[in-house]
Amino acid sequence: MVVLGSTGSIGKNALKIAKKFKVGIEALSCGKNIALINEQIKVFKPKKVAILDSNDLNGLEPLGAKVFVGLEGIDAMIEECVSNLVINAIVGVAGLRASFKSLQTNKKLALANKESLVSAGHLLDISQITPIDSEHFGLWALLQNKALKPKSLIISASGGAFRDTPLELIPIQNAQNALKHPNWSMGSKITIDSASMVNKLFEILETYWLFGASLKIDALIERSSIVHALVEFEDNSIIAHLASADMQLPISYAINPKLASLSASIKPLDLYALSAIKFEPISMERYTLWRYKDLLLENPKLGVVLNASNEVAMEKFLNQEIAFGGLIKTISQALESYAKTPFKLSDLDEVLALDREVRERFGSVARV
């Protein structure tokens, strides 16, 4: 298989599962962590390797693997690969082209890159995509019982780093505090997206594209991250999916569902320790961006605006140019600005053009 973003949290776990399942690695790609990809090359001996920046070529030790550079290089590498499975764990809109290229070359796409569906779900062949996500894996598992007719899909949120922070202190928080996730060990972007609830807005849009626009879609807070998803059926019964907070479960099913179902990749749950499970509504006072959930479901192509504004604000937030309130304000202003715009977005070029436009318009934000 091919692992894009092999040095990140998902990529490292994917390689762990590949080793366990004895799946060969044809190609790897990374952003900046050349030291780690060099280690991965030694262990997995890929035939092809892609890195983002040509300045890193000197430090790369490909050990005979063919080397590709940049986003265009990743596209070319995917095209040359004979593997029928691509794991796309590239962070941000940078992973969008790789998703398109994987599907264009008739590969199955195991998708951890949320931005692909958020920005271009209407252009992707959903039948060839397996989401690498605990919530969507949970929904998929719950929807296997075809005898029951689903009415609404509910995903859970942990509440992120600021779930107990006094409301008046949230706007002045910095990136260091936002990165203290209570339950998961993840990359910096998704951890901050959890604090802002942008991650859950992304997942709501992913649910829309993956499982059908006709169903009611919502989210709630479940602090322990044990309940990942719930489905309410037409008979008013509800079934929940419970599992340890470990991404190896959805990754293993994305790589090989048969082997994943026969051997455990996560710790068993201690049912007697589950007395603390409690569901809470997502407070719009605490998570002000949550008020855009219905707008995004009514006009899901606004996902391009949500993602682009979030990425430019995130960069400034991580660079300590703005506080958390500035990040929220940037995204709010962008969504308000485009709320009534009818989008066509009939191909990838139009999606990327809107993405660039939003970045240019909202790239300079006020310090808050």
Curated annotation (Swiss-Prot):
Keywords for this entry? Isoprene biosynthesis, Manganese, Metal-binding, NADP, Oxidoreductase
Extract one GO molecular function annotation from the record: manganese ion binding
Q: Which InterPro entries match?
A: DXP_reductoisomerase (IPR003821), DXP_reductoisomerase_C (IPR013644), DXP_reductoisomerase_N (IPR013512), DXPR_C (IPR026877), DXPR_C_sf (IPR036169), NAD(P)-bd_dom_sf (IPR036291)
Q: Which GO terms are recorded in the biological process aspect for this UniProt protein?
A: isopentenyl diphosphate biosynthetic process, methylerythritol 4-phosphate pathway involved in terpenoid biosynthetic process
| Enzyme class label | oxidoreductase
UniProt keyword annotation of Transmembrane helix present: no
Task: Please list the reactions this protein catalyses.
Answer: 2-C-methyl-D-erythritol 4-phosphate + NADP(+) = 1-deoxy-D-xylulose 5-phosphate + NADPH + H(+)
Instruction: Give the protein's biological function.
Output: Catalyzes the NADPH-dependent rearrangement and reduction of 1-deoxy-D-xylulose-5-phosphate (DXP) to 2-C-methyl-D-erythritol 4-phosphate (MEP).
Q: What protein name applies here?
A: 1-deoxy-D-xylulose 5-phosphate reductoisomerase
